[in-house]
């Protein structure tokens, strides 16, 4: 086994030269850390050729990767937007908050080790408080039980483990594991970040990860392909982030649902690999299954810079037939973006698809009465923490410093990985930020996911923050519903920190230097890759031991952080009748509303405790309040989890009624485990976000959609619900919902669903995990 970082400290080698002794039959490792995981390009091409003969049409790049990973290329039905594909991903990546439940589920399956390469990354449990080293030490102390569990479980079941301080999962994957043409799934919704290296990287729930860990095919509804044609070249203050911010404004938060976003056109060759990663990362904010760029020179340069030149050379041998779209490949729809005319965007507040070009922000902010003083500027996160991001932001800081200016706001910097932190420390950007007044946070997710002990304002104070993050839902970053959070490029965030004003436009507006003289900030500049190569920094990787027989994984029965799982009961074979509505949620109901992160992250391995946050952020249509619902039997108003428990403890099934794009946001399967644990039976909505809908199915719940969305408005919180015809539940066949109003005659509504035959078995068995265990016994 190679040392975790031994091969990464090497100078950049630019160019397209191919290693002469490589052939298309060569065995090439997927990465520098695992000896026995090889790139399967030849098998992918053979599988793809079978499908090509069947379909007899040109393929997009995304289709090539998908069809090259089919479990049964001869028999698989393939219709974009219709079929369910059975796929064989190359590997799995898990972050520490979702890994706990994924591993607990894997343990309950009783298997000796994972069937595919798996890594676990400690990035979600580190709270930003005072700064990097102190925050990291505090997190290691607070989360020792969880980290010890993950370290021992990964060792026991043959997984790689990245310790706290390593960095954010997606940056680590890009630096070490991503390669063109691969298919990876990850238990985090921003897994698509790896699309910047030409990989199909898809966010999933933990139960999906368990399928692959157990050696089973993984199922995905065949996505449609949204082609985004990029022409021209960016200049000045425009950055890759602005492409996805503009696209979010065009498509909205659900415009990518059921689709892969594939970028093409001459503009794709103008970005760095990390810039392409930024664009793919935030495709999650439009609901896309994933996003991807075709293999190109920038990817070769990044692979070489990170010690993986052999992979780059191997990929060149498969460029035409596997790692690029066919000529005349057809997309289901196409959006065109002219990079020459693209300007910087600021998206928000409260939703990532409210897109405002910087030239319009002044008038829009004033018209909407948004707080104009920027209180905090935050750069970094999995979306924007590359060497290029940090270098370009540092160039702006240096320009301001030359005029005697420092940050007018609180300014935080989150390095994406230990490698990035060590490199920008060596090259001086870190010191530049500190002199500017910046606070360098730990190599972790931090404020982006609500891990922020913010103390400069009180909860309820109206204020504005601007970050280079990806999400800006209400209360997400700091728990304050009055924080107006905007997302932008790190360059623009830095400019706002200097000006301290949301109305500032660095393209047109002047600042005053320390002597009162006016000047304009110069456009940002910076290297895409470090000229002296990357500095690996501290070794933070734990490889699984060769002998795992003596490794013990312990979970204390008295722990409040970890809890072994008990199987959910199978369906009783009967229609569900007279069910109360736990809550009729109105408006945006994201996974942050359903299962809040922040202070609740510490309970992600303990289903009973984490269930105390179920739907506490959702707004009740009856009274427009959060976490205040009526028990229809007692008339008492209580919190949502308390009321759900009251129903469950009396043996009463219940339903939730939801609005559009229910479950938007994170991949966290806790948002599906919790309603199942609390006795829920069905979640009935106008529409679902992809990952959440799948997670609900995996846990034996019924995600159902109103055929007529207007029926949502006809339902009252006091109504009782029957779900009829479940014995005949079949793919494509609607079910009947009978509504019993408190006063009035019953009425019926048609509910649709997306269940296929196997998913119906999950429902009948009580969960997908129950089905796996039953199959293992056969």
Swiss-Prot record:
It is an enzyme of class 4 (lyase). [4Fe-4S] cluster binds at residues 382, 445, 448. Substrate binds at residues 95, 188-190, 471, 476, 604, 667-668. InterPro entries: Acnase/IPM_dHydase_lsu_aba_1/3, Acoase/IPM_deHydtase_lsu_aba, Aconitase/3IPM_dehydase_swvl, Aconitase/IPM_isomerase, Aconitase_4Fe-4S_BS, Aconitase_4Fe-4S_dom, Aconitase_dom2, Aconitase_mito-like. Induction: Highly induced in the absence of glutamate. Induction is further increased when both glutamate and lysine are missing. Keywords: 4Fe-4S, Cytoplasm, Iron, Iron-sulfur, Lyase, Metal-binding, Mitochondrion, Phosphoprotein, Transit peptide, Tricarboxylic acid cycle. One of its GO terms (biological process) is tricarboxylic acid cycle. The modification Phosphoserine is found at residues 391, 556. This is Aconitate hydratase, mitochondrial. It comes from Saccharomyces cerevisiae (strain ATCC 204508 / S288c) (Baker's yeast). The lineage of its organism: Eukaryota, Fungi, Dikarya, Ascomycota, Saccharomycotina. The gene is ACO1.
């Amino acid at each position: 086994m190679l040392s975790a970082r031994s091969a990464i400290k090497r100078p950049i080698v630019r160019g397209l030269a191919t290693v002469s002794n490589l052939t298309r039959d060569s065995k090439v490792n997927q990465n520098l850390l695992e000896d026995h995981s090889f790139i399967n390009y030849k098998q992918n091409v053979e599988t793809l050729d079978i499908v090509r003969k069947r379909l007899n049409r040109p393929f997009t790049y995304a289709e090539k990767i998908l069809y090259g990973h089919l479990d049964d290329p001869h028999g698989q039905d393939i219709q974009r937007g219709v079929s369910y594909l059975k796929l064989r991903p190359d590997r799995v990546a898990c972050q520490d908050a979702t890994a706990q439940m994924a591993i607990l589920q894997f343990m309950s399956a009783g298997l000796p080790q994972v069937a595919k390469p798996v890594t676990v990354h400690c990035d979600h449990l580190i709270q930003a408080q005072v700064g990097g080293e102190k925050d990291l030490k505090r997190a290691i102390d607070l989360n020792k039980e969880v980290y010890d569990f993950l370290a021992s479980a990964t060792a026991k079941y043959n997984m790689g483990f990245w310790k706290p301080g390593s960095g954010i999962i997606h940056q680590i994957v890009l630096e070490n594991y991503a390669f063109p043409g691969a298919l990876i799934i990850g238990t985090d919704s921003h897994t698509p970040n790896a699309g910047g290296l030409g990989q199909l990287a898809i966010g999933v729930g933990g139960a999906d990860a368990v399928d692959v860990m157990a050696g089973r095919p993984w199922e995905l509804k065949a996505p449609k392909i949204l082609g985004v044609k990029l022409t021209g070249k960016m200049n000045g203050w425009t950055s890759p982030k602005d492409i996805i911010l503009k696209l979010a404004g065009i498509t909205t938060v659900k415009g990518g649902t059921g689709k892969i976003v594939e970028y093409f056109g001459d503009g794709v060759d103008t970005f760095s690999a990390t810039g392409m990663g930024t664009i793919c990362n935030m495709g999650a904010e439009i609901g896309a299954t994933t996003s991807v760029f075709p293999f190109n020179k920038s990817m070769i340069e990044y692979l070489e810079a990170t010690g993986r030149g052999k992979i780059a050379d191997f990929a060149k041998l498969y460029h035409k037939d596997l790692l690029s779209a066919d000529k005349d490949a057809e997309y289901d729809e196409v959006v065109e973006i002219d990079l020459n005319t693209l300007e910087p965007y600021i998206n928000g507040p409260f939703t990532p698809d409210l897109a405002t070009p910087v030239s319009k922000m002044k008038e829009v902010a004033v018209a909407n009465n948004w707080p104009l003083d920027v209180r905090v500027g935050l750069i970094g996160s999995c979306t924007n923490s590359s060497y290029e991001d940090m270098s370009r932001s540092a160039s702006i800081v240096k320009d301001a410093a030359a005029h005697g200016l420092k940050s007018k706001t609180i300014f935080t910097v989150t390095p994406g990985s230990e490698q990035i932190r060590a490199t920008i420390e060596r090259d001086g950007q870190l010191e530049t930020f500190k002199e500017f007044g910046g606070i360098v946070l730990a190599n972790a997710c931090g404020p982006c996911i609500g891990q922020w002990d913010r103390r400069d304002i009180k909860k309820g104070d109206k204020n504005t923050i601007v970050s280079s993050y990806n999400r800006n839902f209400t209360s997400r970053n700091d728990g304050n519903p009055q924080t107006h959070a905007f997302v932008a490029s790190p360059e623009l965030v830095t400019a706002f920190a200097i000006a301290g004003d949301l109305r500032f436009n660095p393209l047109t507006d002047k600042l005053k230097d320390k002597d009162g003289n006016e000047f304009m900030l110069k456009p940002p500049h910076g290297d895409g890759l470090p000229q002296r190569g990357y500095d690996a920094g501290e070794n933070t990787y734990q490889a699984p031991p060769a002998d795992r027989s003596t490794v013990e994984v312990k979970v204390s029965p008295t722990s409040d952080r970890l809890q072994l799982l008990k199987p959910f009961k199978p369906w009783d074979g009967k229609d569900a009748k007279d069910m109360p509505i736990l809550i009729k949620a109105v408006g945006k109901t994201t996974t942050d509303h359903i299962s809040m992160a922040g202070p609740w992250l510490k309970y992600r391995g303990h289903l009973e405790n984490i269930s105390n946050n179920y739907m506490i952020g959702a707004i009740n249509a009856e009274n427009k309040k959060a976490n205040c619902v009526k028990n229809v039997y007692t008339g008492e108003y209580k919190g949502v989890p308390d009321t759900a428990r009251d129903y469950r403890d009396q043996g009463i099934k219940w339903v939730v009624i939801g609005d559009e794009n229910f479950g938007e946001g994170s991949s966290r399967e806790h948002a599906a485990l919790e309603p199942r644990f609390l006795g829920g039976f069905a979640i009935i909505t106008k529409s679902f976000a992809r990952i959440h809908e799948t997670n609900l199915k995996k846990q034996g719940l019924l995600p159902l959609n109103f055929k007529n969305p207007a029926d949502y408005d006809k339902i009252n919180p006091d109504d009782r619900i029957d779900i009829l015809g479940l014995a005949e539940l079949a793919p494509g066949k609607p079910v009947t919902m009978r509504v019993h109003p408190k006063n009035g005659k019953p009425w019926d509504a048609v509910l649709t669903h997306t269940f296929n035959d196997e998913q119906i078995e999950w429902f009948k068995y009580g969960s997908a995990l129950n089905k796996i265990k039953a199959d293992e016994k056969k």
